[in-house]
């Protein structure tokens, strides 16, 4: 890929994107490739719009349990922001007593749109929360109930239907090779939750993490369009299963001629016949009411 003209023919039926969150050029190129007929995994339009706090809000509405979570305004802003004009609708100071009463301690302070364990802090009391929040800079943050889990599971998901639950240790940030660590009831809860989230979010490639406490699986992190699927991370036997599942899914997408355009207004303008404006092309303009 190099200089990309606005009109180009698709060279591929399917592209699997695992880098555009770090290299913006790829994201821009993939959107245009999608217009040209390539099916991109994951959908670059939705990936650009998605973020973690929306995911928590969505999960609560589709019946997937999540920890109590509060979205927080940024602590600081770029110099061009005038607090008196641009921030006059923000509550200040924040109602920390009400926020912490709802979430409880300990809690996790993390970016509302982040990943890779960056800028994540565990806070045990209000002074620790203030210290971590004051250091968060211009990031919009979330404060989330900490689940003191009995088990922790990360599901690698491909094509919305293939779901591979693997025991995970978030303290050491590594997978654990274990068998039969979930009861049938817990396994069903995890698989059903991951399935619902993948379908609701529209992800063809994702990882969904659950913290399990007292028989309840809480979805902790599930908006991961480029999940860690490296052979050194997920263990060779799991890596083989995931690669095979992704290969089968990519071939299926290519054969079916899938599109990323479903639900987007521009789709109808890429088809024939195209919609026509009122007056059947004779021209129209907005006029003030009399």
Predicted regions and their residues:
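Generic enzyme active-site microenvironment
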Residues: 15, 41, 108, 207, ...
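Phosphate-binding core of ATP-grasp and ATP-grasp-like enzymes
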Residues: 136-140, 146-177, 191-207, 211-218, ...
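Short loop/turn motifs at secondary-structure junctions
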Residues: 11, 65, 202-204
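A long amphipathic alpha-helix within ATP-dependent nucleotide-binding catalytic cores
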Residues: 173-219, 241-244, 248-258, 267-279, ...
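Glycine-rich phosphate/pyrophosphate-binding beta-alpha loops
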Residues: 20-21, 223-239
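Active-site nucleotide/adenylate-binding loops and adjacent lid/helix of ATP-dependent enzymes
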Residues: 34-37, 45-153, 159, 179-180, ...
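Short secondary-structure boundary/hinge segments and terminal tails
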Residues: 5-8, 51, 76-78, 117-118, ...
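ATP-binding N-terminal substructure of ATP-dependent carboxylate-amine bond-forming enzymes
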Residues: 1-41, 45-50, 54, 78
